[in-house]
Amino acid sequence: MLRVIVESATNIPKTKFGKPDPIVSVIFKDEKKKTKKVDNELNPVWNEILEFDLRGIPLDSSSSLVIVVKDFETIGQNKLIGTATVSLKDLIGDQNRSLPYKQTSLLNEKGQDTGATIDLVIGYTPPSAPHPNDPSGTSVPGMGEEEEEDQGDEDRVDGIVRGPGPKGPSGTVSEAQLARRITKGKSSRRMLSNKPQDFQIRVRVIEGRQLCGNNIRPVVKVHICGQTHRTRIKRGNNPFFDELFFYNVHITPSELMDEIISIRVYNSHSLRADCLMGEFKIDVGFVYDEPGHAVMRKWLLLNDPEDTSSGAKGYMKVSMFVLGTGDEPPPEKRDRDNDSDDVESNLLLPAGIALRWVTFMLKIYRAEDIPQMDDAFSQTVKEIFGGNADKKNLVDPFVEVSFAGKKVCTNIIERNANPEWNQVVNLQIKFPSMCEKIKLTVYDWDRLTKNDVVGTTYLYLSKIAASGGEVEATTGETEVGFVPTFGPCYLNLYGSPREYTGFPDPYDELNSGKGEGVAYRGRIFVELNTFLEKKPPEKKLEPISSDDLLVVEKYQRRRKYSLSAVFHSATMLQDVGEAIQFEVSIGNYGNKFDATCKPLASTTQYSRAVFDGNYYYYLPWAHTKPVVTLTSYWEDISHRLDAVNTLLVMAERLQSNIEAVKSGIQGKIPANQLAEVWLKLIDEVIEDTRYTLPVTEGKANVTVLDTQIRKLRSRFLSQIHEAALRMRSEATDVKSTLLEIEEWLDKLMQLTEEPQNSMPDIIIWMIRGEKRLAYARIPAHQVLYSTSGGNASGKYCGKTQTILLKYPQEKTNGPKVPVELRVNIWLGLSAVEKKFNSFAEGTFTVFAEMYENQALVFGKWGTSGLVGRHKFSDVTGKIKLKREFFLPPKGWEWEGDWVVDPERSLLTEADAGHTEFTDEVYQNENRYPGGEWKQAEDTYTDANGDKAASPSEMTCPPGWEWEDDAWIYDINRAVDEKGWEYGITIPPDNKPKSWVAAEKMYHTHRRRRLVRKRKKDLTQTASSTARAMEELEDREGWEYASLIGWKFHWKQRSSDTFRRRRWRRKMAPSETHGAAAIFKLEGALGADTTEDGEEKGPEKQKHSATTVFGANTPIVSCNFDRVYIYHLRCYIYQARNLMALDKDSFSDPYAHVSFLHRSKTTEIIHSTLNPTWDQTIIFDEVEIFGEPQTVLQNPPNVTIELFDNDQVGKDEFLGRSICSPLVKLNSETDITPKLLWHPVMNGDKACGDVLVTAELILRNKDGSNLPILPSQRAPNLYMVPQGIRPVVQLTAIEILAWGLRNMKNYQMASVTSPSLVVECGGERVESVVIKSLKKTPNFPSSVLFMKVFLPKEELYMPPLVIKVIDHRQFGRKPVVGQCTIDHLDRFRCDPYAGKEDIVPQLKASLMSAPPCREVVIEIEDTKPLLASKLSEKEEEIVDWWSKFYASSGEHEKCGQYIQKGYSKLKIYDCELEDVADFEGLTDFSDTFKLYRGKSDENEDPSVVGEFKGSFRIYPLPDDPSVPAPPRQFRELPDSVPQECTVRIYIVQGLQLQPQDNNGLCDPYIKITLGKKVIEDRDHYIPNTLNPVFGRMYELSCYLPQEKDLKISVYDYDTFTRDEKVGETTIDLENRFLSRFGSHCGIPEQYCVSGVNTWRDQLRPTQLLQNVARFKGFPPPVLSEDGSRIRYGGRDYHLDEFEANKILHQHLGAPEERLALHILRTQGLVPEHVETRTLHSTFQPNISQGKLQMWVDVFPKSLGPPGPPFNITPRKAKKYYLRVIIWNTKDVILDEKSITGEDMSDIYVKGWISGSEENKQKTDVHYRSLDGEGNFNWRFVFPFDYLPAEQLCIVAKKEHFWSIDQTEFRVPPRLIIQIWDNDKFSLDDYLGFLELDLHRTIIPAKTSEKCSLDMIPDLKAMDPLKAKTASLFEQRSMKGWWPCYADKDGTRVMAGKVEMTLEVLNEREADERPAGKGRSEPNMNPKLDPPNRPETSFLWFTNPCKTMRFIVWRRFKWVIIGLLLLLILLLFVAVLLYSLPNYLSMKIVRPNA
């Protein structure tokens, strides 16, 4: 960043017309910035800051600035005054530097000195890349909004941005820079779950700065997820809020990330509509992607959403947190020093970027394939009246574009499925935007009802724009970043199935983008461009110009694509019934229910599922595999997808190599082998990243985004390449490189994202009957063939892949898999479709197919009885066909004639797939009521009553043999003893509906069931059975049914009335085409529509191409001539951590193992969650069609489904695991499969692991190449063979069974006499029974021992199972709790190592030792006489809170504490158990939770107790003569209960969850310990989320019975029940027993007095003796003077620890101090405060706030502890601020007098922030004509103040109905306002001044020196910033301060005020009293009435003065003139009046 401060210029030459108006332009590297002009000035002063963003490029020696000074002309060109060039080489360096450039000469055009000079200050900040979320970072601010507003029009960038372009024009480089860091973190956002979860969003509104407006009362409203919170109303332009809002939501993560956080600031004083002052919007996802999911103390730039041309409306400082389940909020560090708070560098913006107005110009051209959305009723009516119906276009689409809360809609185009809008949507936003995606929703407009959503798609800004920051930082590239750009390109829409029904769509949510769309629903053609401009667009919606429409034509060019899918198998079916078929579609092509495309062979034939003999069903396709083909037309985007596939190959290879390295590290393979694996990884990365991506040049449809993405990818690949080369040469440790290598993988995965992928996904549907059942979506690029070669083709192109279909809206695969498909898909351009031949396996055959139908009429078969059927039809019988009209398409020719070819797959018998079967037949008799039973007319029937053959006629089918000798009656039913069941018919039925077992007189029918079992004849081969079956079939190929539409069967029955047979004619491809000829079949075969002309149009349309079954498309299949026989062995050894699904806390697991069309079941293992099957499942003679090499590359998966066996009811699903077998094509291959743990998944939840592997062997004909069979444990139950099963070793397991805790009742009775059973590896050991759990919860003998054969490899280690058995009456021993421990490696130990780590330490063991003689701490009385007085004085200055604040870094609150040398404590921001150094305080014994009962699907199992104990595992020698290793658990403490004193110190709460409607809480503490409860309700703290409790509680308890200390925070409510905020539980037993001394933290110093008095029971020397004894060291030896101790073989000196430290008077004896220093080196828990998270059952895994506290535990057997700490909160002190308003000057003259003079009636108002109700104001200085006012008026403001924290305490009721006062802590600020008094209207506000009393602006001595420059600006680097001082330190100030007002966004001087400010404490105020105003006591100082001019008066109260000072002064000469004129007029009048008399008298009496 380069900052130029243009200060002033001198001696500017005059112009011809007078003084110039100078303006300065500063030019740096083609970028120009200007100052404002100064009118009519030869020595102008600008004092303006111009900033230049260096774009990451540091200055070099050639860098310079050009300064141009011109004379501003309103009209015409500015005239040059002078120029100067300033070299910047003196600023170069790594540090921030600022240099003055004074008296720089200005030169004219000829280079001559003009005599004028200019003064500059230039500051330089070198480019750096701190984290943008670090408030303390030195991130460089960009060009601010104000500066941007001042640019001239000539510098504005209005051009369209199509990428960075070359350097040159001003602004082009900055366009790329503008997009920097937009993609920060977002593109790497993890895949988000669609399962609703609990989230908590927290927003802390801290303060505002420079809010616009005068005399404002701002309030902030925060709106998220439909919830709104608002702050309290404040006053002033810089309000301080510090309010925290909580938003609890239950929503899916994907939806939450799109929610907007809206922060708006309103002026509550305004009643007008324009009270919105500014807003800021950001999406939740942006915050979630920040480190810690939080934005900490960042400034937001507010702007006016309506007026886009306006500048910044102020700043708001906030913190935002988004907490998911289990997330902990990061600690928020408060910053008290606002001087360091540089707003610009701490804006919530990417580093170095200014917000700029940009316009997103989104061009929406057209859409296609929009599905029907409206009912066809109106079209049907039109059709009836002879109109033309248009059912294809039953949709009225329009597009809604939404971004950052703004929405714009296009026009509605009625009845058009392919609309053309050709409109531009203009969205103007601030950029870079905090919102992530532009949402485009296509709606169907409805006149009467709500508009329906057709589909939704998004444009992600992070994917269509790039910062390039990471690349530029390392390569110096400046043009890798680019602003958002997209297309022209199609965006695909996905959602619910396209088929329209009049009913509500169950999958409607999918259309709104919630969940994965299951069907293609059209696409829209759009283009996005970004303009950088300040002026808003004239219209939000306008038409696209015709020129633009022509330009985008080339982007819509289509090419023909061919797709082939060969279905190899469909297995694992469970829901069987109707026949099944599969449909493949891409876009609309292939959708069999859609009539908009040509008919395609896109569906397989219907097939019926066959039982696999064990559990599942499969489709019997055998060697004839169904094939679907379709052709489609799409844009050729191979240049995009080739790059994606190539990058995916790189990423997958790197992923597999990373996993190989990780498994090597986990398996602890030798270092040289690990290095080989690692080198292979690095070498492959180097090789892969050399690859150049496909070139885009020359392609017609290349967009700007294509070019930019290619450039970005190339730079990233080269970056990874260089990093890999560097790592290969420099790396020394494999583990340390993994983090960087995984970052490479993340980068590669980001690069694979292709936003312009316009090719729709391939969708496979399973259709049963006519209903879509399950689907799979396959991205087209995965199967796309590329002509580029290499890895550009898709991963599965032409390869067989396994796909698990899923049900719509099922987020993950559930208990049932609809079907497992193995399918081979090839997709490619039709131009290269012959390349398909090289991928094709087998022989492709195509058949034309039709069915001949006949009915039985009068005993003869014929066509006359075919009601509604045709003689020849399709398979449904509904579409009429005729063989003469079948023509082979191009590339195909007939091969042979029409032949009868029966379809066997649809006619499977009930016994198909079974090895055992029971035939049944019913014997029927009837009678008249009361008569004799006689044979019925149909003597033998089936179960439905239909006629059947008699038992004597029924023969055993070929391949079967009878198991029973004869037919027997079935009496295992609800029948009588002879097997009869009885019924009665109710007309019109002729058969009974129900049957009963007892005969009644009214029964008229009875029947009994005859059964006979048969089984497969294993001696016969499948081929001989098939031949025999063919002989049974009808020779003519007929299949029969009882009625039309019923199920067909082979053998004719007497009840059959309908038959059909299939005719087929084969087509073969011509030699030139090969297998690719199958793509020529589009719309090839048609139905006969020439006959039956009476069929109307609608009927024809009904039978059109794709209705019902698409029967007129050809049947394509792939025939495999050769079948390969394989042999599969699946070795399933064991499982672990399965779900408990039985009430006894266990399961009875077994597994179905499925491979292709075969499956088998393991044995059932009862009552375990960790079954060991040790079983080999063998599938012999598995038929697989296709080349063995294909099977080797993509072998079929082995699927293992685990179930819990239940005696009653259905077996419950436990989970599914998939394993890929090792393929052996050559028996000589010497590779042994390795057992591996595979996860067991139930949906998306991991439910255990199974240890399994499998091998697939290509079998010889005689099977001679197969390995020998493993040994059998039982008949047909093979074990896992040696060499594959784990190698075991004799191992010792020592169990420390300490005790049981918190056992819950079992079957409503308490657990009283439990024992412990430990099982591992088939061995079992049981503990002694605890006689009374309530009295002694510990086991009497604590150590158990067992010898087990455990695997040597850690990977195969079985879990260890703990069971608790309760010994009850009558010999019952139920399992009342169990626990499985997986990872046993943490318990392994070396039995010969020292005993240091295996015995507990400190007090627990001390209790079992003889008691210490000295337990009383003797303190020598060495205090001076005045010690008590001194300590009292010190206590005022130093308290425990001083220690706390000194330790937390808040030094301004701790006074002189640090300077006095006192000790600090450790503040942990987590629980003490979570501190890594203390191992969870489980070093003596772990706590294992015990579980019981059935696991619910979505709930964790219930905890029913705890086991306290530990384990030690070590190998035993194989030779029994070798002595066994020493036992590990020795010297155990006594396990009897101990009585203890517990002190709980609660310091403060942090960010508590609000419980009241006002968003606050009234918290108090509740403590529960055993049966003791302390409810501190009386000391609740009202209305706060951050309460300072400062409370200490002391209780006594017995350990371990009362080990759980529960600390709860409750919300006090007066009238309703108190609500729990949250609670935390501390295990006191762990703290008591831990070797880390966690019972009482060790302080830094040993003090015998003062605030840090020693509080432990034992002195440091005693503690050190105990530590030495437990560690096996000799006792410590103390020197005589106590300054040296010998401990652990080393001498410790006191001087070592206390050198250069301040020693105060409270320290104890030297030997104790030295012992304490040694103790602090032993890793013990220090004196501390821990921060514990509060949890609630309402949101169990989300923090409800935190509690800072600690606990001390003292056993009473060791005597009384020391005195407790006093942590009572500090009390505020009373202070007074006295403000004397002396005078004002230069106040704005706001009024005009009646005589037209400018004047103001001035008065001054003032208050302290937070105490607005205590406003005070002066009297009025009337009629100030020059802005001067005289007052001599005193304000006195009392306030409560905390000197240590430098905050005011304000306590007041929020509402008049509030019960409690709310306490606020606000900075002490004085607000002074100048007002103009009006008698008959509202007073006018003139200006204000805000003074922070801690940083008070030092006033000017005279009014002339007082200016606005004294007011500090927001920029921390501003060198003109005014000096400030603390009024609390200076005590008083006097001088002139400026007041200002806001006018059009800028500050203007409103006046100057002369004041005296004085701060006094209460004592000083009493000593020096003073009254308010000039009232008594008027002293200190005495204020005399102001000597105001005589003109100062209120005019209507002083008429004389009004005449004298207003009338006389203004109109004096007028009055005098008028008087003289009046006298003159009177004189003339008198003269005229007297003259005639006088003249007549003179005439009459001349001498008179």
UniProtKB/Swiss-Prot annotation:
Belongs to the ferlin family. Ca(2+) 3 binds at residues 1142, 1148, 1204, 1206. The modification N6-acetyllysine is found at residues 540, 871, 1494. One of its GO terms (cellular component) is nuclear membrane. Interacts with EHD1. Interacts with EHD2; the interaction is direct. Interacts with DNM2 and KDR. Interacts with RIPOR2. This is Myoferlin. Residues 1964-1975 have a biased composition (Basic and acidic residues). Induction: Up-regulated during myotube formation. The chain crosses the membrane at residues 2013-2033. InterPro entries: C2_dom, C2_domain_sf, C2A_Ferlin, C2B_Ferlin, C2C_Ferlin, C2D_Ferlin, C2E_Ferlin, C2F_Ferlin. Mice lacking Myof display fewer large multinucleated myotubes and are impaired in their ability to regenerate skeletal muscle after injury. They display a defective membrane repair in endothelial cells. They show also a delayed endocytic recycling. GO terms for molecular function: metal ion binding; phospholipid binding. The modification Phosphoserine is found at residues 170, 174. Keywords: Acetylation, Calcium, Cell membrane, Cytoplasmic vesicle, Membrane, Metal-binding, Nucleus, Phosphoprotein, Repeat, Signal-anchor, Transmembrane, Transmembrane helix. The C2 1 domain associates with lipid membranes in a calcium-dependent manner.
